[in-house]
C-alpha cells in the first residue's frame, strides 16, 4: 500500500491540523507550525482581496494589456494560503523523529498518570498525534507538570 497522500486529502489534513495544533508561545521556538499557521490564517483573510484588487485595478484603468500578468499575480496570491495548508497537511502525516517520539511517549505517560483517559500510545507517532497530546497536556496538566518540558 502506498504511503502517498493526495492533494485534497493533504489539504483536509492541513485544515484539521491547523485547528488541533496548540498555538502557545512555549512551542514557537521549537516547532515552525505556529508561524505557518499564523501566516496561513493571515493569507486566508487577505489574499483573496489582493487577488481581486490586482485584476480589478487593471480593468478599472482600461489596461487590458496587463490583464494576463495581473491574473498570474492573482493566482499566485490565492495559492499562498493553499501552500500553507498543504504544508501543514504533509507535516501532520509525517512520522516523528526518535527524539520527539520519546517526548510524545513521556507526555502521554504523564497525562495517563494524572488520571485522564487517552487513546493508546502509537508505536510510530506522527505530528498529528503529537499535536493532540500537546493540546491535551496544555489543557489538563498544571504548570508544574509542564516545567520539565517547557
Swiss-Prot record:
Keyword Transmembrane helix: yes
Topological relation to the membrane, as annotated: Multi-pass membrane protein
Keywords: Cell inner membrane, Cell membrane, Membrane, Transmembrane, Transmembrane helix
Pfam families (alphabetical): DUF412
Entry's transmembrane regions: 42-62, 70-90
Family: Belongs to the UPF0208 family.
Protein's recorded name: UPF0208 membrane protein VP2081
Species this protein is from: Vibrio parahaemolyticus serotype O3:K6 (strain RIMD 2210633)
Amino acid at each position: 500500500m502506498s504511503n502517498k497522500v493526495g492533494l485534497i486529502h493533504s489539504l483536509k489534513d492541513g485544515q484539521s491540523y491547523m485547528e488541533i495544533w496548540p498555538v502557545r508561545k512555549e512551542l514557537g521556538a521549537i516547532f515552525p507550525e505556529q508561524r505557518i499557521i499564523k501566516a496561513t490564517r493571515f493569507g486566508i483573510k487577505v489574499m483573496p482581496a489582493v487577488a481581486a484588487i490586482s485584476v480589478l485595478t487593471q480593468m478599472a484603468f482600461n489596461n487590458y494589456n496587463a490583464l494576463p500578468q495581473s491574473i498570474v499575480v492573482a493566482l499566485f496570491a490565492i495559492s499562498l494560503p493553499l501552500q500553507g495548508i498543504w504544508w501543514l497537511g504533509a507535516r501532520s502525516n509525517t512520522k516523528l523523529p526518535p527524539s520527539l517520539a520519546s517526548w510524545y511517549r513521556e507526555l502521554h505517560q504523564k497525562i495517563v498518570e494524572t488520571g485522564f483517559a487517552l487513546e493508546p500510545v502509537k508505536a510510530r507517532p506522527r505530528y498529528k498525534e503529537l499535536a493532540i497530546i500537546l493540546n491535551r497536556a496544555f489543557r489538563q496538566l498544571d504548570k508544574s507538570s509542564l516545567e520539565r518540558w517547557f
